[in-house]
């Protein structure tokens, strides 16, 4: 089982993953080299990102995923995935900072890389969550909202099975954890069993069995 959490910054995603690991301790969260890359100051990110930096981050995310998968661990949870990179690249594209060709190339890479996962949980923006300043973190509330709008648009393409950013075949389930922050973790047992495995088509979700 490989699970990823995606969503805009400063929105309680890391806290949610911490809660997830407490409830499902069989899961491991691999170390992130792309975060080290950002913190090193060698590349720019967020509003100041470039094609070079976004490419480096995309490669690092894919390398992290492949390295973790190669360990043979059955239960892995990731903070962000290739879709996050695409979202931030799309924002940069809208502001003339990366080319259309770059987006096309990144999309083709991401649409294959995303097949690695079994479930991707999308964490929608909750405006009541305060932005906490931190190194290498964007703290503009407008930017945070714009990024979330792009996430929602991409999730919409998944729901419509358009095959633009998510593959039509071998695609992970993409699930939005709507509602206030304290209810996010309570929704996950609808999809993940106490054993750490997910409810598949053969046994339905917990919700369908009620």
Tell where the protein language model's regions lie, with residue ranges.
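Short loop/turn segments at strand-loop or loop-helix junctions that form parts
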Residues: 32, 79-82, 121-127
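C-terminal accessory "lid"/substrate-recognition subdomains
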Residues: 159-176, 182-210
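Conserved substrate/cofactor phosphate-moiety recognition/catalytic segment
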Residues: 18-63
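The conserved Walker
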Residues: 9
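Hydrophobic anchor at the beta1->P-loop junction of P-loop NTPases
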Residues: 5
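Glycine-rich phosphate-binding loop used to anchor ATP phosphates in small-molecule kinases
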Residues: 55-115
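A glycine- and Lys/Arg-enriched "phosphate-lid" helix/loop adjacent to the NTP-binding pocket
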Residues: 88, 92-159, 170-178, 203-207
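Conserved lysine of the Walker
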Residues: 13
